[in-house]
Every structure is written in C-alpha cells, then in structure tokens.
C-alpha cells in the first residue's frame, strides 16, 4: 500500500495515524514525503546545527492553513523510521506563525496498544517540561540561519484544540 492510501486515523480525532518523515534526534535535514508518489525527498539541509526533538510527520487526508497536511510531533522511546506509520492520540498543539503564515504543530503520543509509557499523558501539560521546552526551542530557532525565514511561537494549546485542528483540517481536505 502506498503512503498516500493511509487513512487519517482509526477514529478521528481521538485515534490518528501519523506518517513519519523525520525520526527523533535526526541530523538537520528536512525530509518530506511527496504526497503523489509516496517517495521520501530531501526538502533542504537546515542551516542550524539542531536535531529534531521528536519524530516528525503528518496526518494524511488533512489540509492545514499552510496548504500542507497537518504536522505532528510524536515523542517515542526510540526514533522511528521515515515512511513508517504510527497510531497515536493527540494531546496538544504548538501554535506558531512563520514567513508563510499560520503553522501549527500537533503533539500526539503513541496509542496504548503500542506502549503503556504514555497512558498518563492526556494533555500537553502532562508531558515533561524539558521536552516541551526542547520542542519550543527547536521551532523558535531552527530557521535562524536561513535568509528570509522566521518563526514566532505563540504557545501551547490543549488536547481539545489539537482535536479541533484535526477535524477542521480533515474537512478542509475534503473540499
């Protein structure tokens, strides 16, 4: 099955599938899966010497306000392979704006059928403070050395906001 055939989830917005593009702790290379071919492309080499603090991917069959599928960060005990799909539960969203407009990043944890490690995490506030600080710091600075690019982090919102983002982006993609 091609990655573009992966559904958005098992039971939106509570139970989602995230297609991983970049593993946690990866080198500063921005990968993107081409939505038409399902191939993993190098989007760019990041100028800052930073690594992704979580696995990074997207929810298929969604369309966020920036014109791309909804971005999702997935903390896991181990880095995931690019192109893998993980079943998750949304717990929050980091609201941001960049040079292209609004750019929210959802945070979702692995479903309890995969690991019990995140069962206590019901909302972004339940994540470790250090992890939230690392995520925020990464997105505040990962474009610092790229001419004409910038990011403004507006702050964290809860699981309800993440679920609302999933539903609205799913409806937007159907139009």
Swiss-Prot record:
Keywords: Cytoplasm, Hydrolase, Magnesium, Metal-binding. PROSITE patterns: PPASE. Mg(2+) 2 binds at residue 71. It is found in: Cytoplasm. GO terms for molecular function: inorganic diphosphate phosphatase activity; magnesium ion binding. Its main location: cytoplasm. Its cofactor is Mg(2+). GO terms for biological process: phosphate-containing compound metabolic process. Substrate binds at residues 30, 44, 56, 142. InterPro entries: Pyrophosphatase, Pyrophosphatase_sf. It catalyses: diphosphate + H2O = 2 phosphate + H(+). Mg(2+) 1 binds at residues 66, 71, 103. Its EC number is 3.6.1.1. The keyword Metal-binding applies. GO terms for cellular component: cytosol. It is an enzyme of class 3 (hydrolase). Homohexamer. Belongs to the PPase family. Catalyzes the hydrolysis of inorganic pyrophosphate (PPi) forming two phosphate ions. PANTHER family: INORGANIC PYROPHOSPHATASE. This is Inorganic pyrophosphatase. It comes from Yersinia pestis.
């Amino acid at each position: 099955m091609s990655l573009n055939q992966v559904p958005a989830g098992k039971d939106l917005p509570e139970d989602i599938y995230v297609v991983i593009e970049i593993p946690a702790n990866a080198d500063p290379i921005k990968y993107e899966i081409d939505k038409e071919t399902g191939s993993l492309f190098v989007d760019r080499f990041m100028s800052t010497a930073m690594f992704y603090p979580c696995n990074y991917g997207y929810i298929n069959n969604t369309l966020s306000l920036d014109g791309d599928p909804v971005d999702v960060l997935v903390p896991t005990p181990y880095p995931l392979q690019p192109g893998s799909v993980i079943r998750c539960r949304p717990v929050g969203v980091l609201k941001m704006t960049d040079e292209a407009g609004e750019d929210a990043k959802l945070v979702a944890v692995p479903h309890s059928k995969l690991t019990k490690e995140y069962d206590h995490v019901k909302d972004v506030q339940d994540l470790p403070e250090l992890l939230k600080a690392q995520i925020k710091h990464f997105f505040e600075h990962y474009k610092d050395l790229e001419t004409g690019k910038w990011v403004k982090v507006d702050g964290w919102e809860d699981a309800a906001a993440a679920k609302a983002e999933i539903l609205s982006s799913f409806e937007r993609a159907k139009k």
